[in-house]
Amino acid sequence: MSDLDRLASRAAIQDLYSDQLIGVDKRQEGRLASIWWDDAEWTIEGIGTYKGPEGALDLANNVLWPMYHETIHYGTNLRLEFVSADKVNGIGDVLCLGNLVEGNQSILIAAVYTNEYERRDGVWKLSKLNGCMNYFTPLAGIHFAPPGALLQKS
């Protein structure tokens, strides 16, 4: 694997990592579905395992999006290990802030994502994502509001 191929692969994989988070936060079905191989698995500890692009959309449409008014995910500390020229293992930390539908409660989630990425026919996509939550913490008395929301109530 050439240095150029390794750098291009790393950039493509970093985009996949971000696209998963952006797809969930912005509720962009096309973006979210486009990052998975048909035989991929997305597992969220305590929720379940979903397969392929259709499974990712099922998880988003029937579990995540009905659970939250909105979310924002911050993905950090992405570390990639090239197993071969066409397979990469990744680990990264994710911080999610959001407002739950139930109780209109704000929440903080800290998780570790362990991912597997594969290149097939020159294209990188996710083959496995495992989300392990370290914290799922309601923020008592707090509701995240957009900028200016408090000013509008005055």
Swiss-Prot record:
It is found in: Periplasm. GO terms for cellular component: periplasmic space. It catalyses: gamma-hexachlorocyclohexane = (3R,4S,5S,6R)-pentachlorocyclohexene + chloride + H(+); (3R,4S,5S,6R)-pentachlorocyclohexene = (3R,6R)-1,3,4,6-tetrachlorocyclohexa-1,4-diene + chloride + H(+). The keyword Lyase applies. It comes from the Bacteria. GO terms for molecular function: lyase activity. Its EC number is 4.5.1.-. Belongs to the HCH dehydrochlorinase family. Catalyzes the conversion of the important environmental pollutant gamma-hexachlorocyclohexane (gamma-HCH or lindane) to 1,3,4,6-tetrachloro-1,4-cyclohexadiene (1,4-TCDN) via gamma-pentachlorocyclohexene (gamma-PCCH). Proceeds by two successive 1,2-anti conformationally dependent dehydrochlorinations. Also shows activity with alpha- and delta-HCH, giving alpha- and delta-PCCH respectively, but not with the beta isomer. Homotrimer. Is not N-terminally processed during export, so it may be secreted into the periplasmic space via a hitherto unknown mechanism. This is Hexachlorocyclohexane dehydrochlorinase 1. It comes from Sphingobium indicum (strain DSM 16412 / CCM 7286 / MTCC 6364 / B90A). The gene is linA1.
